[in-house]
């Protein structure tokens, strides 16, 4: 299994135009399903997992292993606190569980400053997953979340479009939006808005970046070297 994962290509999120072609091809069936008021839940899971796995692999599986350990850790904490909140509401228990939820990212951020090496617990997206994990613990304590199903919890954490770049979201809002399929007119408006954002992203990341980095910057760099700057 590990050899198979190592052979998977590394697909950097938003790194090149090819990535967008993969995304469009993958989400087209999802959009068609929503257009006809259908959700292909298992297909959505497979799409998210495919992009997350290829985001974290590419000859190495250390980030994928770190994600697996992270998920196990957070699941144990959430299950414990969910059960605990059914009968009690101690503030120190809440503080402790929140701190334990933050522990992986604390190690990831502190270790390089201590010994100059990257933590084995680090992976792309750990910051956003930590915001979501702690947010769920807070919502459990506040009573915003009354019933937390593990399937919904993992779907929230591993939602591919916001895995590596956000934005930060709340479980309750995310879950309500997921269960509500937009009307066709609204869906088409959302599609048009998405296309507009993608075009702006292409303009900034690929066209302007190429003009500035490949056309304008080299002559300015040479001029600075010639003048001793």
Question: PLM features: what roles do these ranges have?
Answer:
Residues 2-229:
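Membrane-embedded transmembrane alpha-helical bundles that form the catalytic cores
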